[in-house]
Amino acid sequence: MSKLKITGGNPLFGKVEISGAKNAAVAILPATIMASKGVCTIENTPNIEDVHCIERILNGLGCEIKRQSNSILQIDSTNITKTDANTEDVRKMRASYYLIGALLGRFKKARVELPGGCPIGVRPIDQHIKGFEALGAHVEIEHGAVIVKADKLIGTNIFFDVVSVGATINVMLAATLAEGNTVLENVAKEPHVVDVANFLNSMGANIKGAGTDIIRVTGVKELKGCTYSVIPDQIEAGTYMIATAACGGEVTINNVIPKHLESITAKLIEMGVDVIENGDSVTVKSKGNFKGANIKTQPYPGFPTDVQQPMSTLLTIAKGRSIVNESIWESRFKHVDELKKMGANIKVEGRTAIIDGVPKLTGAIVKATDLRAGAAMVIAGLLAEGDTEILGVEHIDRGYPNIENKFRSLGATIVRL
């Protein structure tokens, strides 16, 4: 298994291009299953392991996939007949549950192995099941697989008990090809929810209200292929913003939607970091001298849970005490023990981390326990004194394209071994 070696202490300067959004791509690609006519050309897809994993899954189901470049995929799902997704790729990747909504919508049946992904606590799919059943599907969980069947899907009103990105997207997928009108309430508003809705509409769906509290879906009889470009990745952008703040320097982060970054931008400015918005880019200027802040993760437009771990790393060297409350996922402090190896002063109580800033971190051998923890450890290595080796790089590769090359272009000393 490969690892990253980082010699810390270099300020970051230059420009970095942000790739397409992982969280959008891993839903849009399964949604191409629903196009019974024509070819879907998906542009600005990130060149990451999670996308490669979905490519393999779709191939196994009978989709014809042509990769035109590192960021453009052509997917022809017209001849797909298989509705049983049971490979190891399905089991290891959480976003494979979007196959359920896509297959149920088009074929009115699906069997999908229960998915995996990052080990960050209990991540149930009860709200997905509630939505599918409300549309008229029969749902069973048997031998580690979700089995859904329906004679037909009928639109209805569905109120989610909790705000769930996955359930919002999955039920929206199924409702797109249901009969009549579906109203989804207490839905997630994340940018990638809106992106999936926009993609479905480009295929011929009738979805209104994505990004608001209520999504209204008028069912259509079929969807057709289209050309669509995935939105920029707000989490990747936030990671480079935080890294620049931590290391000092000046970096312009291109191909972003600044509105999607507002909660991150506001927190960095509160800490004393300069952030300048310029159309489709943001520039971060930092002297490496900033104060602590309190963070509470919340659904969009609140502070994103996927940026909590990188931000926690920044706070380890901030002046004063910071309190981080993780309200979205339990067990998302697995990076803390690794940061402690580098000299961080952090105490975890339940879903809260109390961080007292220290003058510096020092290099150590650490591991990436999950995707965003991996990004946190890269930032820790960049800001630390001395050499850091990061094991478990496969987690990082799931969501960050060419992370070592991008940081190296900014002046970091980082290599893959």
Swiss-Prot record:
The keyword Transmembrane helix does not apply. GO terms for biological process: cell division; cell wall organization; peptidoglycan biosynthetic process; regulation of cell shape; UDP-N-acetylgalactosamine biosynthetic process. It is found in: Cytoplasm. Signal peptide: none annotated. The active site is at 118 (proton donor). Pfam families: EPSP_synthase. Pathway: Cell wall biogenesis; peptidoglycan biosynthesis. Its EC number is 2.5.1.7. The keyword DNA-binding does not apply. Cell wall formation. Adds enolpyruvyl to UDP-N-acetylglucosamine. InterPro entries: Enolpyruvate_Tfrase_dom, Enolpyruvate_Tfrase_sf, MurA_subfamily, RNA3'P_cycl/enolpyr_Trfase_a/b, UDP_GlcNAc_COvinyl_MurA. This is UDP-N-acetylglucosamine 1-carboxyvinyltransferase. It comes from Clostridium botulinum (strain ATCC 19397 / Type A). It comes from the Bacteria. Keywords: Cell cycle, Cell division, Cell shape, Cell wall biogenesis/degradation, Cytoplasm, Peptidoglycan synthesis, Pyruvate, Transferase. Belongs to the EPSP synthase family. MurA subfamily. Its main location: cytoplasm.
